[in-house]
Regions:
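Cysteine-centered metal-binding/redox modules
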Residues: 121-211
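Output/docking surface of receiver
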Residues: 37-40, 93-127
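Conserved phosphotransfer microenvironments
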Residues: 54-80, 93-94, 100
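Two-component/phosphorelay signaling modules centered on CheY-like receiver
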Residues: 20-41
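Non-catalytic signal-transmission and effector/linker regions of two-component phosphorelay proteins
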Residues: 1-24, 197, 204-209
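Conserved beta-strand segments of the P-loop GTPase G domain that flank and frequently precede/overlap
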Residues: 21-22, 56-61, 90-93, 113-115
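Acidic, metal-coordinating helix/loop segments flanking the phosphotransfer/catalytic sites
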Residues: 39-55, 63-65
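Conserved phosphotransfer cores of two-component systems
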Residues: 50-51, 78-86
Length: 211
């Protein structure tokens, strides 16, 4: 088990934690006894039950796909557990990933923030938590992204972004990905308006001219 400077405080009976952060990168140092970092999913669940944090935060950085799936499973458990499900669950992502956000939505995650690979600090954590609003809701972040964003695994750690409206034959990247596919502007994209295939479970999308 990974040990932290706060991991053994099972007898703590003071105020509840302001937040509990699960970040397996291990690059965070709490500044207050009411802030806590853990470096594993097991520790996170244990401390979430024991310490009753006001907010639970899980960070997804660049990592193997299997580790990402494990963190999603943690989110599922946190929102199903009767002792942790009422605490707002915030997920920090290093990039937009529609498939992952859809999994987090199903898991019951409340909020999402995109922070790239920013090094976290106590002040930054508090700023993000206090500033959470409707635009950070998982549903809102999910609906912004193009439904044709697909991901093909290259290896255990990397995926290629492709356009489902073009039969997954067009690789996406650069400005087009960030300015169109990952924003509300995807609704004006010619591939979105005239797809060669429909996204799973959705009605056919047609252009304004009915073509």
């Amino acid at each position: 088990m990974i040990q932290t400077k706060h991991a053994s405080r099972k007898g703590q009976t003071g105020k509840s934690l302001r937040y509990l952060l699960c970040d397996i990168s291990g690059r965070f140092e709490p500044k207050s006894e009411r802030e806590e970092w853990v470096g594993s999913t097991t520790q996170c669940l244990d401390r979430a039950v024991e310490a009753k944090p006001r907010t639970i935060v899980v960070r997804f950085g660049p990592m193997p796909i299997r580790e990402r799936e494990t963190l999603v499973e943690l989110c599922v458990v946190l929102k199903r557990n009767t002792r942790t499900r009422n605490a707002p669950l915030l997920v920090l992502l290093h990039e937009k990933h529609r498939g992952l956000i859809e999994d987090l939505k199903r898991a019951g995650v409340d909020f999402i923030k995109f922070i790239a690979e920013t090094r976290l600090s106590s002040s930054r954590m508090i700023e993000m938590i206090d500033g959470l609003g409707p635009d950070d809701r998982v549903d809102r972040q999910f609906e912004i992204l193009c439904p044709y964003l697909h991901y093909d695994a290259i290896d255990a750690c990397h995926e290629m972004k492709v356009c489902g409206a073009y039969l997954d034959r067009m690789v996406l990247g650069g400005k087009w990905l960030h300015k169109v596919c990952e924003t509300e502007h995807h609704s004006t994209c010619k591939y979105f308006l005239n797809p060669r295939v429909q996204p799973h479970g959705q009605e056919p999308v047609t252009s304004c001219g009915g073509g």
